[in-house]
Amino acid sequence: MRYNQFSYIPTSLERAAEELKELGFDLDLQKTAKANLESFLRKLFFHYPDSDYPLSHLIAKNDMDALSFFQSEQELSKEVFDLLALQVLGFIPGVDFTEADAFLDKLAFPIHFDETEIIKHIHHLLATRCKSGMTLIDDLVSQGMLTMDNDYHFFNGKSLATFDTSQLIREVVYVEAPLDTDQDGQLDLIKVNIIRPQSQKPLPTLMTPSPYHQGINEVANDKKLYRMEKELVVKKRRQITVEDRDFIPLETQPCKLPIGQNLESFSYINSYSLNDYFLARGFANIYVSGVGTAGSTGFMTSGDYAQIESFKAVIDWLNRRATAYTSHSKTHQVRADWANGLVCTTGKSYLGTMSTGLATTGVDGLAMIIAESAISSWYNYYRENGLVCSPGGYPGEDLDVLTELTYSRNLLAGDYLRHNDRYQELLNQQSQALDRQSGDYNQFWHDRNYLKNAHQIKCDVVYTHGLQDWNVKPRQVYEIFNALPSTINKHLFLHQGEHVYMHNWQSIDFRESMNALLCQKLLGLANDFSLPEMIWQDNTCPQNWQERKVFGTSTIKELDLGQELLLIDNHYGEDEFKAYGKDFRAFKAALFEGKANQALVDILLEEDLPINGEIVLQLKVKSSENKGLLSAQILDYGKKKRLGDLPIALTQSSIDNGQNFSRESLKELPFREDSYRVISKGFMNLQNRNNLSSIETIPNNKWMTVRLPLQPTIYHLEKGDTLRVILYTTDFEHTVRDNSNYALTIDLSQSQLIVPIASN
């Protein structure tokens, strides 16, 4: 374990003493440091009628227990404080450590003993994470140190778990959206699942916009998947034009219906544990699946601003700008009298994507988004540089396949009976519009590109993204983060994992940082919390997070690739082609080991190479035919210890998100030896070699200069490392699988790897 503590708010002595007193700690500025520490420790054992017993189970020195120490005349020292602090946080002498000083250095322990600062040390200790993954104060509250009185209690600028999660209100409302996406002449209704604590105070809201939450249709999804085996189409030379079109909602009328009290209820919905954490701290949770999902009406428009509007309508309802009904019969309306109108959206992948889309509308009431692994351009999710390009792990998927997965109205047999014919018509229109034949950018994709509206974002923004996420690739967050207005508060956590959540990792206090931010933005708490704009997980060692100023630098280093002419054959033998098509993981293993069709260049680094931004391959290339696709991957190659990309559980169910509520496991990325690590990758249709809007012809056997931008990253390579460059054609995970007889030739003497270099 290593501390990377970004959430602690430095506090004055007076404020620290006041907050400790509010928690019931009987400390006195006039008492000695030793007396105050003893009083603090005894309060921790509030379950015991006699605190001597648990105090005797701690040691103050290697040869003295804590009870004996406090009964002695010995003075409090750094050695004693450190040893007791470690034990209070759950670290066991002789098991987790033998030498406390060395262990504290390894932990990067954030508290440095000064006898005159004991009150501040105790305050800081309570806000510091235990071995279990919870802060000490959260651990104490989870054990019942504070009663669940359904009111706010704060410590170090963060809300504590004092809302009763055993008496939650669970209700359903149906919000009227200014849409008619299925063109039935009726405004679409959006189902909203609400979970909120009982409270006399207006509550802020965490909203998870999740098209998955009302169910998914995996059978329809699998039937809709596309075969990847097809020839690369030769496209006609042309220029692509698109236009920015404002989304115009339909008109709605003020509602004059009576207020209804008898709301639909529910017992369970698959929740997001970060939401649960905040539910126990006085934040209502709502789950919204949007148009075309079970319980709602309309068509699943998948990614456009009509879908975004269906979520926006819910924020409007929370702020009395839209109508909600008690049921589909629309006999009574319902108001969000319990809400303070301020909203933060949460969720990963599609969920985070909807958060980004919502933010670009500038809707009033949306105070903050926490968007994890989020898409900012749907074209860049399903296409790349003029190619159909499947997201990592999902060959054959496209946006209409995702529509089939998430159009959960068809999971309700009655809805299927009444509406499936119309749904199939609209789905066919969507399949035609996305143009899987050419892979080109068009108006359909432009209408699903949130980057063009990034300037309208006015809420606070928090992004998290994995630099090993080949599903929602790093370009998605790179482009939106760098497009955000300079006038807003923005934050980015870049981790070394894949497509995963990070709120329950041991090495980073993400949960507590979000608590401090949300108390600022949604509760108006003046806590003076300041979070760095960008925090990056160091790839060279375990559990080390660093502040970074920018994602993408203008300083570059050009690396020569060699002097040879290298031939890349596109064609595979029939058996090999079929085998790779059945198992793209076997293809990846062969590719990285230099066995698949490729041109391979290994570069032994003579100095450190700190990459920050978008690597570009500038290549001199020619094709034997009038077509060609180019794929590239950059590897950190050779056996050494690296971070894995999938977090593993360190302890099971050790994190309590409330008071015995919604427990989850503590996780972390493992650090272990492996043979290589993908740093970046990229794909291009050579007919789009100049830009996305220009379709060029490819002259047979004529040299072309190609600039292939790879996925942005921040990655530190050290002197002596091997940088492996792999150039090839068909990628069996991502691209169409064209097995025709053509070859690419690369002139390495006229080619370079252009690397953005991080400054010191």
Curated annotation (Swiss-Prot):
It comes from the Bacteria. One of its GO terms (molecular function) is serine-type peptidase activity. GO terms for cellular component: cytoplasm. It catalyses: Hydrolyzes Xaa-Pro-|- bonds to release unblocked, N-terminal dipeptides from substrates including Ala-Pro-|-p-nitroanilide and (sequentially) Tyr-Pro-|-Phe-Pro-|-Gly-Pro-|-Ile. The active site is at S349 (charge relay system), D469 (charge relay system), H499 (charge relay system). Its EC number is 3.4.14.11. Keywords: Aminopeptidase, Cytoplasm, Hydrolase, Protease, Serine protease. SUPFAM superfamilies: alpha/beta-Hydrolases, Galactose-binding domain-like, X-Prolyl dipeptidyl aminopeptidase PepX, N-terminal domain. InterPro entries: AB_hydrolase_fold (IPR029058), Galactose-bd-like_sf (IPR008979), Pept_S15_Xpro (IPR008252), PepX_N_dom (IPR015251), PepX_N_dom_sf (IPR036313), Xaa-Pro-like_dom (IPR000383), Xaa-Pro_dipept_C (IPR013736), Xaa-Pro_dipeptidyl-ppase/CocE (IPR050585). Pfam families: Peptidase_S15 (PF02129), PepX_C (PF08530), PepX_N (PF09168). One of its GO terms (biological process) is proteolysis. Its main location: cytoplasm. It is found in: Cytoplasm. NCBIfam families: PRK05371.1-4. Belongs to the peptidase S15 family. Homodimer. Removes N-terminal dipeptides sequentially from polypeptides having unsubstituted N-termini provided that the penultimate residue is proline. This is Xaa-Pro dipeptidyl-peptidase. It comes from Streptococcus pyogenes serotype M18 (strain MGAS8232). The lineage of its organism: Bacteria, Bacillati, Bacillota, Bacilli, Lactobacillales. The gene is pepX.
